[in-house]
Amino acid sequence: MRILLIHSDYLKYETKNKTGIAEEIPEDKMQGDFRESLVVFTAVEAEDEDNPESVIENAVNEIIKVFNDVKAENVVIYPYAHLSSSLSSPKTAVEVLEGMESALRSEGVDVSRVPFGWYKAFKISCKGHPLSELSRSIRPQPPKVEEESEESEWFILHRGETVKPGDFEFKNRDLENLVKYELGELESSGEEPPHVRLMREKGLADYEPSADVGHLRWYPRGRLIRDLLADYVYMLVTSEGAMPVETPIMYDLEDEAIRVHAEKFGERQYRMKNRKELMLRYACCFGAFRILSDSFLTWKNLPASIYELSTYSFRLEKKGEVVGLKRLRGFTMPDLHTVCADLDQSLEEFARQVEMCMRTGQDLQVNYEVIFRATADFYEEYREWVHEVADKIGKPVLLEILPSRKHYWIAKMDFAAIDYLGRPIENPTVQIDVESGERFGITYVNSDEEEVNPIILHCSPTGSIERVICSLLEKTAIEMDEKPPMLPLWLSPTQVRVLPIAERHMEYASDLVSELIAADVRADLDDRSETLGKKIRNAAQDWVPYVVVIGDSEMEGKLTVNVRETGEKLQMGLDELIERIRAETEGMPFRRLPLPVKLSERINF
C-alpha cells in the first residue's frame, strides 16, 4: 500500500461519474466538506492481497501516529489509484479501505471515507508545516505459517491387510522407491533423467529458449505422439459416456468461488493484471464447474461426466524444479469431471474410473505404482470399500491416512510410473471432491424435487500428456539392457520403414510404401544413397518397429521383415505384415505420418 498524508485546512470533493468498479453510495456521500483533517490518499497494491489484515493494521498504526503528531481533528481516507502502478483487485481495495475505516473508528478516531471507483472533483488546502506532507509505503507481514498439523499415517495395503512400511518385505523395487519418496527418504542423485536426452535425440521436443522456462517446442514426431495420446483419451472417456466441452484458459479472480478454489492449489499460479486480476488455469476445473453450475440437472441425469483436454494448463513451478517432460510450466492435461448424486454413487463411479486408469497403464505398456490417500474419518467409515478398490490393483499399494481434510477431496487414488532414477512420475488420478458442488453453486433436483449439491469426481485417466511421454521414454531407458528401446506400435511415428538396397529396387520399394500407407500404416522410404548398413542403423536409432529390406529376392518373393522387439528376421507377404500391424494396434487411434515419406526430403530439426 502507498499512502500520501496531507494535513489540511480543508478538503472538498464532489463525485462526477461512476467507473465500472464504482461502489454504490447514498446521496449524502456524493459530496463532502472536511475541516482540519488528515487526508490519507491511499492506493491498495497487489502485494496487499497476500495479507490484507496485516496491511490494514500497519496502515492504521502509521496513520494514528501522524494524526497525533499533527493534532488533526479527523481523518479522511481518500482512494487514489495514481499512487501505484501495481494495484490490487477492486474487491480487495474496498475491503482494505473499509477495514482501515473500521479500525480507526474503533480507536476513537473521527474518520470518513471518500467513495471508491468514482471520478471526483476535489480541492484541498495543505497547511504547509514540516509534517503536513508525508508519504509512506506500507508492507504487509508475510501470512503466518500455520502450525504443523499432525502427520499422516502410512501403510502398505495388500489383500485387506495393512502393514507399516518399515515392517513390509518389499519384493517390488518400484513400490519401495515410491514409499521412500513419499516418506522423504529417497536421496536426490542430481542426475538429469534420461528422457530429457531421449526427447531431443528422437526429435520429439526440446526447450524453447525464447519462452518462459518450462515451455517446450514440439517437432512433428512429438506432436504426432501427443495427438495420438489425446485421441486415445478422447476415445476412452467418450466410450464411457463423457461429454466433451471446451472452456477458457483464463479466469477472473474476482469470482469468489474461483479465487477460493485457486487458493487451495497454493502459490504456483500464473497471474496477471489488466484492470482485473486474472489467472491462467492449472486444470479444467473452473470452466467445467461454471458449465455445470449453469446447467439444469436432475437425479435422472446422474452420474454425468464432462471432459476437456486442456491445451495448455499452466503451473508456475519453481525454476529449479522444472525438468524435461516431467515437470513443466505449460502442459496438456486431460480432465474428466463427474457429477454424482451422493457419496454412495461417487464410490461406485470412483471404482469404475480406477479401472479406467489401470487400463491406460496396460494400453501404454507402463507399470503404475499406486497410492490411496484418504482422511481418517473417511477411512474409518469406508475401510472395507477402500480395501476392495485397492484389491483391484492386484498388488500392494501405499496407503496414506490424513488426520483431517486439508483439501477439497476426502479420498483419492494416484498412479505413478517410476523413472530411471527411482522417482515417481505422477500420472492418472481419481479424487472425490466434497466442496466444489456447494462452492460453485452446482445443484441437481433429487427424487423429492429438492435442489441439492452433488459430489464431484476429478479424474485424469492418463495424467498430463507430457508425463505419459516421459514415462514411456524413462521405461525405455530402464529396459535398455533387456530389450531394444521402442514405443508401443500405435505410438511409433514410423511403424514400417522400407529400405531399397539399390536404385533398381527404388520403384518397387516406393510402391510398397504407398500400399502400406493406403492400409493406414505409417510407413516411410529411405531413398537416400547410403549403404544398407547405415540405413539399418538409422532405422534402429529412430526405433522403427518393422524394417523391410528390398532386394532382388524380395521383388520376386516374400518380404524380409526385421522385427525390432524380438530381433527376428521374418519372411512374410505384404498382406501378412499389414494384418500383423492391425492386430497389434487394434482399438488404438491412428493418424498419418506428418513428415515427407522420403527421408531425403526431410528437414533435420
UniProtKB/Swiss-Prot annotation:
Cofactor: record remark: Binds 1 zinc ion per subunit.
Main subcellular localisation: cytoplasm
GO annotation terms (biological process): threonyl-tRNA aminoacylation
UniProt keyword list: Aminoacyl-tRNA synthetase, ATP-binding, Cytoplasm, Ligase, Metal-binding, Nucleotide-binding, Protein biosynthesis, RNA-binding, tRNA-binding, Zinc
Ranges for region Editing domain: 1-146
Organism domain of life: Archaea
The keyword Cytoplasm appears for this protein: yes
Chemical reaction(s) catalysed: tRNA(Thr) + L-threonine + ATP = L-threonyl-tRNA(Thr) + AMP + diphosphate + H(+)
Binding-site residues, Zn(2+): 285, 337, 458
Cofactor(s) the protein requires to work: Zn(2+)
Gene3D superfamilies hit by this protein: Anticodon-binding domain, Bira Bifunctional Protein, Domain 2, D-tyrosyl-tRNA(Tyr) deacylase
Gene Ontology terms: cellular component: cytoplasm
Compartment(s): Cytoplasm
Region listing for Catalytic, in residue ranges: 194-488
Molecular functions (GO terms): ATP binding; threonine-tRNA ligase activity; tRNA binding; zinc ion binding
EC number: 6.1.1.3
Stored CDD domains: ThrRS_anticodon
NCBIfam families, sorted: PRK03991.1, thrS
SUBUNIT field: Homodimer.
Described purpose of this protein according to its UniProt entry: Catalyzes the attachment of threonine to tRNA(Thr) in a two-step reaction: L-threonine is first activated by ATP to form Thr-AMP and then transferred to the acceptor end of tRNA(Thr). Also edits incorrectly charged L-seryl-tRNA(Thr).
Family to which the UniProt record says this protein belongs: Belongs to the class-II aminoacyl-tRNA synthetase family.
Domain notes: The N-terminal domain is an archaea-specific tRNA-editing domain that hydrolyzes incorrectly charged L-seryl-tRNA(Thr). Catalysis of tRNA editing is performed by the charged tRNA itself.
Protein name: Threonine--tRNA ligase
Organism in which the protein naturally occurs: Methanothermobacter thermautotrophicus (strain ATCC 29096 / DSM 1053 / JCM 10044 / NBRC 100330 / Delta H) (Methanobacterium thermoautotrophicum)
Gene responsible for this protein: thrS
